[in-house]
Amino acid sequence: MLPAVKTVEAEEEYAEDCPELVPIETKNQEEENLDFITKIPVTIVTGYLGAGKTTLLNYILTEQHNRKIAVILNEFGEGSAVEKSLAVSQGGELYEEWLELRNGCLCCSVKDSGLRAIENLMQKKGKFDYILLETTGLADPGAVASMFWVDAELGSDIYLDGIITVVDSKYGLKHLTEEKPDGLVNEATRQVALADMILINKTDLVSEEELNNLRTTIRSINGLGKVLETQRSRVHLSNILDLHAYDILSGISLQKKLQHVSTAPHLDQSIVTVTFEVPGSAKEECLNVFIQNLLWEKNVKNKDGHCMEVIRLKGLVSIKDKPQQMIVQGIHELYDLEESLVNWKDDAERACQLVFIGRNLDKDVLQQLFLTAVAEAEEQRTAPGRDGVCPSH
């Protein structure tokens, strides 16, 4: 896992207390596969206020599904029977209390990010096999996901399985097209952009035309995530659990997904999905530089002179001298490059296919920069230049 680059001042301050780095032993493929059998998956459930994410979690808590799921609720609808069982006030402060339900699920209420609740939950390991974490309606799921992603790299007992975003059919379009001051991306749009699974809820409350408009807008923002439509947040668990959106198992289905990525233009062009495929292999160090310029330095401009902001990155790439297809994943300033379980059949098949979700993205500029910095084929190489790159700060 590669974290964000610190400023020069921060680096100098950090260097004074920086411990000596020591080499660590990396796990082989078999050990990594075993980890996913023993670790507990975490799915983040997000969505704008009133979209139905708490209804979804309450549905899971009360249905019989033969799964032992621990659910961490951050918000409750008024009059919730589950809320009354969980919200225990002491000294004017709400604290968490784990409640074991009849269907084998565990549930608690928290008023923070849920990380503390998960730490306490791990003491009950053996009583559950899955964790669902609800974020607040205005939360950026990418920030929460990044914490779990980094934690997994440090040998945690949990791993991030996926991000589910619930969208209200009646008010979703209004939320997604709401303009924020100073050019900021609104919360609902960011939640859709980061989702691996998007649930369009309350479809019975709108006309087919309204639903089509919402579908088009969602697809223009996130052309990679799977979209399901539902009423009253009822969905089969197989559609939202065990997505493996961030681990090596995602490479098995990722190739098919990349072939059907939707890149329809977004109405206001603030958040879009762009994708391209380049034949041949890349040098790993060159690929790292390309990604770091996008995610860390944020110094790549589009044709209008605006710096591109990548919120989500995903792709399958061919790395020179490696037989496996490599999975590249990125959220905000974190990214990872790891081997998939699939090998390239032959050199003629090798290619790099990338999907970017973000704002001010320009496919032509991204593809040319990739070719300049990464592509191995000599006929695809162009001389390095500074065009399209912002000055470093």
UniProtKB/Swiss-Prot annotation:
Catalytic function, reaction form: GTP + H2O = GDP + phosphate + H(+)
Residues reported in the UniProt entry to bind GTP: 47-54, 108-112, 201-204
UniProt: Zn(2+) binding residues: 105, 107-108
Protein name in the entry: Zinc-regulated GTPase metalloprotein activator 1
GO molecular function, one term: GTPase activity
Organism, as annotated: Mus musculus (Mouse)
PANTHER family (alphabetical): COBW-RELATED (PTHR13748), ZINC-REGULATED GTPASE METALLOPROTEIN ACTIVATOR 1A-RELATED (PTHR13748:SF31)
GO cellular component, one term: nucleus
